From Swiss-Prot:
Pathway involvement of the protein, from the record: One-carbon metabolism; tetrahydrofolate interconversion; Amino-acid biosynthesis; glycine biosynthesis; glycine from L-serine: step 1/1
Segments forming a coiled coil: none
GO CC annotation: cytosol
BP terms from Gene Ontology: glycine biosynthetic process from serine; tetrahydrofolate interconversion
Organism listed in the record: Vesicomyosocius okutanii subsp. Calyptogena okutanii (strain HA)
Location(s) in or outside the cell: Cytoplasm
Xref: InterPro entries: PyrdxlP-dep_Trfase, PyrdxlP-dep_Trfase_major, PyrdxlP-dep_Trfase_small, Ser_HO-MeTrfase, Ser_HO-MeTrfase-like, Ser_HO-MeTrfase_PLP_BS, SHMT-like_dom
Pfam families listed in its UniProt record: SHMT
Quaternary structure and partners: Homodimer.
Gene it is expressed from: glyA
Descriptive protein name: Serine hydroxymethyltransferase
Residues bearing the modification N6-(pyridoxal phosphate)lysine: 230
Binding site for (6S)-5,6,7,8-tetrahydrofolate: 121, 125-127
NCBIfam families, alphabetized: PRK00011.1
């Protein structure tokens, strides 16, 4: 038997120390990585529950193991809440990640060698949308579309031309670094014109979509995938949604289990259910609205200070800043901001002359700072501090001064209030 007094600090002091240090970092640094967020104490409590002990291969009421009556309740709640939240006819809450959700769709609807059409990683797509290092680029004939050079927005004419030329079996819409509204219906029309499936990866904007702050693709696409963290603010995991089609639903279920996964993570599925419930609250709607406002304020500040924001602004939670004109690298800017306790990620930008481990830009996102409580004034100040650092990159006096401001602002807005 286990003794509850044997806490982590007693059992593994090294891991405990690392966790405490990370907790301190999260409280004292400003997090601007667009794919990150802080999840709620209720979600974290659920992830640490005894549900982690239960194996439950299969689906609710169709398990291969006994003793699943209570985890069936949990998974069915997660399914029902996901369908309600996003207006979907079908939901699979078992994917361990967004990439596995995408892999399951590929396995369900395609065979190796089929042609796919997805957004180029260099222009804001995701690895699983056909990038060469990914399974999606290795196992399938991947054709890539990109951005219009003048507008910095998706080149729908190029998508249509490529679709007609290569006749893909599936077109993938969605992104990991794109700041504008996507015309899901335009993608649907292009897919229909060549008889292709349309898959949408809405991982980055799922929270905005859940509250109507960004257009929903769920009723338009054949299949929609997402992560459950990022803007959605739940546990790390994946989700597959679809409109009613029994054939596709059966294929999707089989692709997850037994296709690419075995037992589902019931403690994570329960945490997903909790986060879906949280996402139905009025407070959450207010939060998502502020996420957009904060991103727009920050992007506009960079523009006013003379920096190139790709596409000229943002309609969601993120934006890209290109430093090609300044001759700066994304890596150098990332490092300098990090020294001031401002965390971003270097990111490739259109026509980037630098390799992926260097880049010429950064990606900035506001989900985390908005969770802390930052408002427009805070975000305007923050963007100005970032511009000050970029204007005099490497000036340690500037970095030190701004680091002090960052620590003070973080103290004003703690992530987790003490009891």
């Amino acid at each position: 038997m286990f003794d509850k007094s044997q806490t982590l600090a007693k059992v593994d002091a090294e891991i405990y120390k690392a966790i405490v240090l990370e907790e301190t970092r999260q409280e004292t640094h400003i997090e601007l990585i667009a794919s990150e967020n802080y999840t709620s104490p209720a979600v974290m409590e659920t992830q640490g529950s005894k549900l982690t002990n239960k194996y439950a291969e299969g689906y609710p009421c169709k398990r291969y193991y006994g003793g699943c009556e209570y985890v069936d309740m949990v998974e069915q709640l997660a399914i029902d809440r996901a369908k309600t939240l996003f207006g979907a006819d079908y939901a699979n809450v078992q994917p361990h990640s967004g990439s596995q959700a995408n892999a399951a769709v590929f396995q369900a609807l395609l065979v190796p060698g089929d042609t796919i059409l997805g957004m180029s990683l260099a222009h804001g797509g995701h690895l699983t949308h056909g990038a060469t290092p990914s399974f999606s680029g290795k196992n399938f004939n991947s054709i890539q579309y990109g951005l219009n050079q003048k507008t910095g927005e998706i080149d729908y004419e190029q998508v249509e031309v490529l679709a007609k030329r290569y006749k893909p079996k599936m077109i993938i819409a969605g992104f990991s670094a794109y700041s504008r509204m996507v015309d899901w219906q335009r993608f649907r029309e292009i897919a229909d014109s060549v008889g292709a499936y349309l898959m949408v990866d809405m991982a980055h904007v799922a929270g905005l979509i859940a509250t109507g702050e960004y257009p929903s693709p769920v009723a338009i696409a054949d299949v929609t995938t997402t992560t459950t963290h990022k803007t959605l603010r739940g546990p790390r995991g994946g989700l597959i949604l679809a409109k009613s089609n029994k054939t596709i639903e059966k294929k999707l279920n089989a692709a997850i289990f037994p296709g690419i996964q075995g037992g589902p993570l019931m403690h994570i599925i329960a945490a997903k259910a909790v986060s879906f419930k949280e996402a139905m609250s009025d407070e959450y709607k207010t939060y998502q609205k502020q996420v957009k406002i904060n991103a727009q304020v920050m992007a506009n500040t960079f523009i006013k200070r003379g920096f190139d924001v790709v596409s000229g602004g943002t309609d969601n939670h993120l934006f890209l800043v290109s430093f090609i004109d300044q001759g700066l690298t994304g890596k150098a800017v990332d490092t300098a901001l990090g020294s001031a306790y401002i965390t971003v990620n270097m990111n490739a930008v259109p026509n980037d002359p630098n390799p992926p481990f260097v880049t010429s830009g950064i990606r900035v996102g506001t989900p985390s700072v908005t969770t802390r409580g930052f408002n427009e004034i805070d975000c305007s100040d923050l963007a100005s501090w970032m511009c000050d650092i970029c204007d005099d990159l490497g000036n340690q006096e500037v970095i030190y001064k701004i680091r002090g401001r960052v620590v003070s602002l973080c103290a004003k807005y703690p992530v987790y209030l003490d009891d």
